[in-house]
Amino acid sequence: MLDNQLLRENPQYVATQLLKRGFQFDAVTFSQLEEKRKALQVSTQSLQNERNLRSKAIGEAKSRGENIGPMREEVNKLGAILEQQKTELDEVLKQIEVISLSLPNIPHESVPVGKDELDNQEIRKWGDVPAFSFPVKSHDELGEALGQMDFALAAKITGSRFVVMKGHLARLHRALIQFMLDIHIQQHGYQEIYVPYIVNADSLLGTGQLPKFEADLFKLTGDNGYYLTSTSEIPVTNTVREMILSAEQLPIRYVCHSPCFRSEAGSYGKDTKGMIRQHQFEKVELVWITKPEDSYNALEQLTQHAEIILQRLNLPYRVVALCTGDIGAGSAKTYDLEVWLPSQNTYREISSCSNMEAFQARRMKARFRNPDTNEIQLVHTLNGSGLAVGRTLVAIMENYQDEHGNIHIPDALKPYLGGIDIISVK
């Protein structure tokens, strides 16, 4: 959510900044609603004061034994007008809130201006793209040939965009989770956190998934209004909702492993085969809560921490700065890490690292006390995948395959697999 004061005082500036995203904000309509709000608030306050004065006069007249009938009738008329204006004011406030909740974040000045992913800017590359002397296979072909990855069975159990893994591939998948957690906790200094995989609407509103992106979520039946979490960013970030932190507590750095559940609305026809786009997948998430002045340095650190996982696994990747037309609605700036997939002969996203600035904090009322001014200020929140586990498995399978369809284990993962160094076709 954007700053209400900024919206009220300079809606045209907001409209200009959001236009960089391709988002049309009707500043004129918003300003008209604001003028109506101010007029109604002044009017209702005036009517409230007038009614209070007249009610007091009725009490005084009654104590003197005077006829208060006409006076009471006038107060009742005032009360009816007041209630009508309160109703109008509530309606205007709701309209303003709907608009405010629909607005995306203002992009940081360093974000490249562009329309879509074609305008994203490559920042750096790491690692050499492997050259194979044989026709490469996709991860799903490799997994099915190994007899350890079964999409048809998953479709029978549930439906499309699910997978059943077993044997060494399932073990490799689990090893990746532990490896990522160990690096982030032991070497990067994150605190591990375990959170619910089911969240309520307030949490989703706080991090910005609601109201705009409900179609991307799995909502549970019943009266609780619960949803399966689409990323552990949601519950982890909401741990500071409606809190006033001390400056000494910042920065907070959490790492969390969780399953994620996404409906993939709008993804019809995209990545229909394999594990690239699933309804259920695992992710190791990094979340930072910082002071405003520290958040962009934190974004660089968070991104580097995610990169280190790819480097330890010796997976070629690149870092891309998303343009204004491609960053997520709540993000002020985002770096994507894209890993090389030989079967597609291209880089594919494996992590998004974002600075949300105060966008989520304002929704969540997540604040801290500034010791220099003693003022209560909004924190900044950041998040990034460190990494998406399924896509990391995909990248290992494809980059570490041999001509026989075997998968060689990266050196960094061998201690997690009891000495297994190859997953072989039987």
Curated annotation (Swiss-Prot):
Pathway(s): Aminoacyl-tRNA biosynthesis; selenocysteinyl-tRNA(Sec) biosynthesis; L-seryl-tRNA(Sec) from L-serine and tRNA(Sec): step 1/1
One Gene Ontology term, aspect cellular component: cytoplasm
Disulfide cysteine pairs (residue numbers): none
Annotated positions binding ATP: 262-264, 349-352
Superkingdom per UniProt: Bacteria
Record's catalysed reaction(s): tRNA(Ser) + L-serine + ATP = L-seryl-tRNA(Ser) + AMP + diphosphate + H(+); tRNA(Sec) + L-serine + ATP = L-seryl-tRNA(Sec) + AMP + diphosphate + H(+)
Record function comment: Catalyzes the attachment of serine to tRNA(Ser). Is also able to aminoacylate tRNA(Sec) with serine, to form the misacylated tRNA L-seryl-tRNA(Sec), which will be further converted into selenocysteinyl-tRNA(Sec).
Note on domains (UniProt): Consists of two distinct domains, a catalytic core and a N-terminal extension that is involved in tRNA binding.
Family to which this protein belongs: Belongs to the class-II aminoacyl-tRNA synthetase family. Type-1 seryl-tRNA synthetase subfamily.
The protein, known as: Serine--tRNA ligase
